[in-house]
Amino acid sequence: MAAAAAVLALLPSFGTEVRAETGSAGISAPAPKPNKGEMRTIKKRMHRSFLPGKPSDAVVAELMKEIGTDGSFSDVDYSSEEFNSGGEKRKHLANLAKLARAYETPGGTYYKNRDLYNAIASALAYWVENNYEDPNWWHRIIGFPKDMMVTVVLLNDDMKRYDKELYRKCTDYLLYSWSVPKQRAQEGANGTDICKFTFAAAVITENETLLREVIEKVNSLVRIAAGDREEGIQPDYSFAQHNGSGRQLYLGTYGREYIDGVLYFMEFVAGTSFELAPEKVALFEEFFLEGVAWGWYKNEMDLNLCGRGLLRDNTGPSFVALTQRLAALGTPRKEALEGVIAMMKGNRELNGNKMYWRMDYMVHRPKGAMVVSRMTSTRTVGNEAGNGEGLDNYHTGDGANYVKVHGNEYTPILAGWNWKRIPGTTVIEDTRKMPAPMWGEGGAGGSDFAGGVSDGRNGVCGFIYAKDSLEARKSWFYFDDYYVALGAGINSQRGDAPAKTTVNQTLLAGKVALADASGAASDLAGAGNTSPFSRLWHNDVGYRFEAGSAPAAEIYKSGKRDVLCISFDHGTGRQGGSYVYAVYPAVGRGDFFGRTGEDYRVLANTPQVQAVQDVRTGRTMAVFYEAGSVQADGLGALSADKPCFLIAEGSGGAVKVTVADPYGEKRTQESVSVTVEGKSTAVPFRNGGSSAQL
């Protein structure tokens, strides 16, 4: 076995006497005398945090046997230089972390075993000597040092004692990313990741100056994004990452890493002079309450929030644990966070409606369900592809409309479902291979018009779809316990393949019941309907269709699972196509088919305006694609002089209107004039919507 003091490759020195390059913000003088008491407290916390997970003695013995005389592991392939081959090389660092835990766990067979130490030191020396790179920059800048951090922190005291040179080179390795101004400037999850191992190096070297620089950077990362493409927490408390081609929802993966990174620092520095600023803690809590909580339902993150990782395990114990960690810190809104935890565990419901205007994304949470609408504009993109994942994500931002009651409606069938039939979308269904939206490229919408408005309980959203020789005006009207979906101006230039609107493509779970215009209900037999139907019920979701609209219901396989697909076929080369349907989440079969009378009226469904009124409350919602007017019971003529989203409720002299513009930061108008029953008022356009009384 090679000695730990083997000749090591030269790396830039970024230890306790780091000197910055010209133009760098690095450390230019020896660090001042550290606050040793606090530093040691943080160091003990880190050590304790990294220690759990000691492997069995048999695993330790086997790993020691696999270390060659040069310090490499026989089960790791170090030779590949292909893109993402770093994933294989990271096994070296994972093995080291296992051995380090065995070495540092009191009472274990290998606790402070010198042979084990020598084996670890040899493998560490091998790693820093070779200083592996990868065509994917992430591995050397983030992945490798993040993995290596565990071993270096656990063994740092003994390395200082036995191998000072190895110790120095290991800490230099951890500090390399911080030395590169471009990498130190990373935002979002990548930014917190780089701070993690830089922080670890600062703590074990007792470099208080560097430690405060890292904490300052973390404070700067807990902020509301300002620029159009800035990553991280957005002004509406959504989370975005990989925004090169447009803002991209990414709470489920990168957001999770970002949250873990911020909590990492909050936990380690709690009660010390290094704590995050109070206003940063308050913002972070608000992000949990207004962002994280709304994207979660029945132990799973919304698919829209998972980026290219749609097919990964997106179930959510990790998010429960993250929220519990924040609440455990005793922050000012601990009680509200405990309410989120109760919701995540299924002991409480989160109800209401929220429009994430920054991301063209609406969440509706009626009693017993969660429904979402994901649109895109020239400002936003759908789920990306990259690193071999998400290759079928082309249509994920084209009106995806997922409805969940039980929580498992989609995940079991994703691997084999039809990606040209994403629920809510209107697309050309052909046999051509879809382009992969690599890192978001090609995933943006074809129009500036997209968005919505919410009053906190109800909401309306919509967009102009323009892609692949197909255009459509699409909107969703969310009322308390149902929603209406409208499509108009469906114009296709493709004569070789039909345009289709998918109402839902969902896991088949039990019987599918159909009712004709007379109201007589029967179970679907075979693989699809053979006669018209006006209502359909399945798995506690009801669907209602307009007379003569001719929806189709079919059952097919996705792997070993059966799938129910409900859709409209608009035909080839269609001009002026449209659709209307309503969806009732969380309703039993008997209650749905026993529902009599009309719940809503479609006031308009044209390329100029789409509007729906709830019969019970009189609440009226509209999408004006241009200046226009609709007639609504109790309100008379309801008009707007500019494109907008609008909610109107009340009657007589007490009508409240809530509006939002459809152009986000690209808007050129500051207000819209709304007229109700002959009375007009100018309502300002504000991000997130604004209200006025008429």
Language-model regions: role of each:
Residues 258, 265-655, 661-669:
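Extended polysaccharide-engagement surfaces of secreted carbohydrate-active enzymes
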Residues 14-40:
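C-terminal segment of N-terminal export signals and the immediately downstream linker at the start
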